[in-house]
Amino acid sequence: MQYSFTEKKRIRKSFAKRSIVHQVPFLLATQLESFSTFLQADVPTAQRKSEGLQAAFTSVFPIVSHNGFARLEFVSYALSSPAFNIKECQQRGLTYCSALRAKVRLVLLDKESPSKPVVKEVKEQEVYMGEIPLMTPTGSFVINGTERVIVSQLHRSPGVFFEHDKGKTHSSGKLLFSARIIPYRGSWLDFEFDPKDVLYFRVDRRRKMPVTILLKAIGLTPEQILANFFVFDNFTLMDEGAQMEFVPERLRGEVARFDITDREGKVIVQKDKRINAKHIRDLEAAKTKYISVPEDYLLGRVLAKNVVDGDTGEVIANANDEITEGVLEKLREAKIKEIQTLYTNDLDQGPYISSTLRVDETVDKTAARIAIYRMMRPGEPPTEEAVEALFNRLFYSEDAYDLSKVGRMKFNRRVGRDEITGPMTLQDDDILATIKILVELRNGKGEVDDIDHLGNRRVRCVGELAENQFRAGLVRVERAVKERLGQAESENLMPHDLINSKPISSAIREFFGSSQLSQFMDQTNPLSEITHKRRVSALGPGGLTRERAGFEVRDVHPTHYGRVCPIETPEGPNIGLINSLALYAHLNEYGFLETPYRKVVDSKVTDQIDYLSAIEEGRYMIAQANAAIGDDGALVDELVSSREAGETMMVTPDRIQYMDVAPSQIVSVAASLIPFLEHDDANRALMGSNMQRQAVPCLRPEKPVVGTGIERTVAVDSGTTVQALRGGVVDYVDAGRIVIRVNDDEAVAGEVGVDIYNLIKYTRSNQNTNINQRPIVKMGDKVSRGDVLADGASTDLGELALGQNMLIAFMPWNGYNFEDSILISERVVADDRYTSIHIEELNVVARDTKLGPEEITRDISNLAEVQLGRLDESGIVYIGAEVEAGDVLVGKVTPKGETQLTPEEKLLRAIFGEKASDVKDTSLRVPSGMSGTVIDVQVFTREGIQRDKRAQQIIDDELKRYRLDLNDQLRIVEGDAFQRLARMLVGKVANGGPKKLAKGTKIDQAYLEDLDHYHWFDIRLADDEAAVQLEAIKNSIEEKRHQFDLAFEEKRKKLTQGDELPPGVLKMVKVYLAVKRRLQPGDKMAGRHGNKGVVSKIVPVEDMPYMADGRPADVVLNPLGVPSRMNVGQVLEVHLGWAAKGLGWRIGEMLARQTKIEELRVFLTKIYNESGRAEDLESFSDDEILELAKNLREGVPFATPVFDGATEEEMSKMLDLAFPDDIAEQLDMNPSKNQVRLYDGRTGEPFERRVTVGYMHYLKLHHLVDDKMHARSTGPYSLVTQQPLGGKAQFGGQRFGEMEVWALEAYGASYVLQEMLTVKSDDVTGRTKVYENLVKGDHVIDAGMPESFNVLVKEIRSLGIDIDLDRN
């Protein structure tokens, strides 16, 4: 087995029983693939498929003018490279985007040409079409300097759907069937039955009309309509009664209304008897062709065709007329012999279309189309052209109606056609097929669709959403272009005069900036980033709304298996509407979710992997991943647990067609990170998944000792770590950069054989947490492609590490851990285990005001020396300054207008001169409740304004850093070149050279070492070929130098050009504060099993319960938090964590004893290879084994994969290995070694019973008490009621509500109550009076009228009630 550089350092022991058949796919693939398909940037123009931008362009172009003599054609498009890179965009608040240019061709036709059109002139030109935001390599977008994610949308697939109302519409509970044709864009077409069984249609949920109007409008006559939906009975009229053609199927189950006889007149069925199968056999045996029926059998039947008098041509009766005695008489008079009637019955052949025709009052096609026009455009006069145009535009025009590939495929599948392609508009037979199926459903044949089935819901990804917006922008452009194309010839316009890119830019900007699906990226930790990008939402434009979504949509559906996670979804109003993709899920070309399965052939499981969509999966029998398999791959058990069409059952192995890929297939990334998930209740697992996303990165991340084995995948795929792009040797490492000399076989000829990785240092994330990368390689290390070189936030040796491993004791402790409170040892705080760094960004802008420009300066009057001491000469705080609430960070003064001066001010001005009063101090100060260290300052200056010294210094530092990078590259490139040169020159014969090298001398190493490197090029070689090579190497080095100089110039130009700032802003300064947050009471913490709580007390180490060897517990949790919540996984995690740490202590003790390597190998083999997945320790050298052992001292990391984890036997084996009997005896453990005798830290007495003790990975969540704590003395008031505002953000007060008032009333504390309701709240005059009294030393309250009472009076008056206060 191949181990990567970081895996070798610390192997996670896996308890998985199954081998890895299929690797977890790249977790951000959905986003990245979707967007690259949209752009097709790297695809040559000729090979671009019709999707994304290409599809949008080809669907709108060519644009033809109204007169038809000018048209604008689309040729191709190209994307330029972005002006700024991602980091620069984030710093400057710009969008990371690329300019889109389209090559278009203007074709003008000759108006004079008599017959066919002749091209008069062609103009081709590249036109700017706006900016398209680009996706970063990690699947996010940088919009206006902040990272955003476009969430995928789960919406109803285009196609046709059949459903019924479940009997809710009509009081009788009758099922009313309906069908709906949903296009990708265009009008919806609904068909529905009413309680009287008449079939109606409606367009876009407008007024309903009988469906036959639509059928007539598409050109069918009533006769054709009936022929499409009914079978006919044939009658031959006799003088008395009639002969009916005998069709056996139609009689079965009917009650005979007369005696049925055979040819000889023998009675086969008596009157009023039900006709059964025997009667039909007898009739068939008698070779009955016709049955004689009495006259009244015909009455009430419905004619299928118009009946015309052969002689006169007069219509005697119309199709769909009921036969009455009068009609029969007319038929006989006209000597009509043959008639056809509709065959209907009550069971499976209802007269629905016939009854609908009776309701329909339109006569022909024109009348029907006019009726539809009136419904769509009420009040407009229907002219013939308008009527035709509207009807064709509804379903037949490609501009207005598009079923899309998916819609056509789904439609054809549903109506039972074989081909899955076809026209993208509706056809007449599509409408007929839909109505036929709907009538069949009403007749009791067939099934309605399940709209929550994932075969009927598809995912719209970034690419598709962006394409829709882009198309919308293009359509707006098309309208404008059409107007102007007419003047193109007369005014000699070029393509760029016709196209205005504003509508496109604004559509794209609006989508990326403010669409419901474009969200501010959750960047608390790497897991929250990945989960956000894998989120699937049913909300958003064209989706559901929270209020309207019922229970069914939110529920877990059998088709979610392996596609959407059944666990991870938010609590609250969005539950079930926002989901997460399952671990292996993948989108197919139509946007349906697929999941992988292993093929099973003849009861043998193969390694062939097939991705199946929800529709395909329904056809197969699929075994679960935990089915027992023999060595030859055969299914062993007699009965295997399996699923078919959503039902779970036990079947024999020969019926199995597929098998799950992995047990973790059904859950999402976050849920698959929970060890022992299978032992947790679903609700708690949901909380666990959601809370892992809120874990704050700790200062020193620590890998979980009990994981699930997916931690490395998550850390690497999230992009928070730094991975080697190419293999090589580490040439240089410091805290900020890693330089790697690339292996020769991976370096491309003529290119720099060096990779430089600049690490991200102390950068602010979207949630103000700290992103910081730390190198984990040393100089000289050999790394391969894909190896982790540096850890990011919340990663430890390339594994996700969200929290810390805490020694946990489950026991009550003096009520301090009552109701989920958490008791924590002071040592945890002292060791900075849960200390996190948060970075706050504070901005100040200097604007140009009416009274003159604001100025950023150090020169501020009446500012204390202490405050000024922190500012440099430009008035900006130094980096490294420690600041507290109220301290000045950036000095700024604003000019203020002349005011009427008081005598005191006049005196001051006379003494101190003018300066003091014409400006006011508007400096940037640290907000209340915040303190920290300044770690970075950025200054942005508008073009054309003099930079201050600080801004210049920042630019110089940046250039210096860049020059360092270039010098490094050059040093390695030259080193590499000179090594190659030396190998080439040694042993060659020279014709002369520096230091008087004689002709014919062989060059040796000593001679070269004696020469300066650059003089090697002056050696004249005898061998011409070698001389040419020497020249080539010299040229390539000079070329590289030239390239580097150009790159440096480019960078300098970028840095020294003015910054784009909002209008009116001259200068902007951003100050970054690093705030250190230690753990304190009130902080929220949680495990991974939904076991959350709040820190109630931090206890001195000496008071914590401790073990016999003096080790105190870190955390004490209440055992009552486990049984009722049914998240037993936490207890199992604690047991396994206890074993993991115990093994680590044993390895540490062996290393301390300096045990032989062989003994270490044996012990490690016992741990890794006795159970679960075996590891290949043989391939490790002794040094590697030693390094591995050193890294395991803090605990052997375990992986217990979801649904395939450690068993109780394996856990007890590990506990036995970790705690031999002598240690167990010393700690007074129970026989199963998972409980320990603890002693009370305060008294030293042992507790009565042993306590469950072990290690749990515990997280500190983002809900920190520092962010919630808030106090106010005076502050802002509400405008109308004059009461203090509420909430921390508004610096508001605490609400003294209704119940609090009752409490004071109950105590009779009338004075306290009075001041609460008046001067402390909204008595405006009273408030100022109190201040006045206090200043005078007179402690009296004059309570007046609360302002809210005046508001109430005004409100009563607004109701027209005259109310006045009698102020006596």
Curated annotation (Swiss-Prot):
Which top EC class is given?
transferase
Question: Per UniProt, which keywords does this protein have?
Answer: DNA-directed RNA polymerase, Nucleotidyltransferase, Transcription, Transferase
Q: Does the keyword Protein biosynthesis apply?
A: no
Query: Known InterPro entries for this protein?
Result: DNA-dir_RNA_pol_bsu_ext_1_sf (IPR042107), DNA-dir_RNA_pol_bsu_external_1 (IPR019462), DNA-dir_RNA_pol_su2 (IPR015712), DNA-dir_RNAP_su2_dom (IPR007120), DNA-dir_RNAP_su2_hyb_sf (IPR037033), RNA_pol_bsu_bac (IPR010243), RNA_pol_bsu_CS (IPR007121), RNA_pol_bsu_protrusion (IPR007644)
E.C. numbers:
2.7.7.6
Give the GO terms filed under biological process for this record. DNA-templated transcription
Known catalytic reactions:
RNA(n) + a ribonucleoside 5'-triphosphate = RNA(n+1) + diphosphate
Which cysteine pairs are joined by S-S bonds?
none
- What does this chain do? DNA-dependent RNA polymerase catalyzes the transcription of DNA into RNA using the four ribonucleoside triphosphates as substrates.
Entry protein name: DNA-directed RNA polymerase subunit beta
The gene designation is rpoB
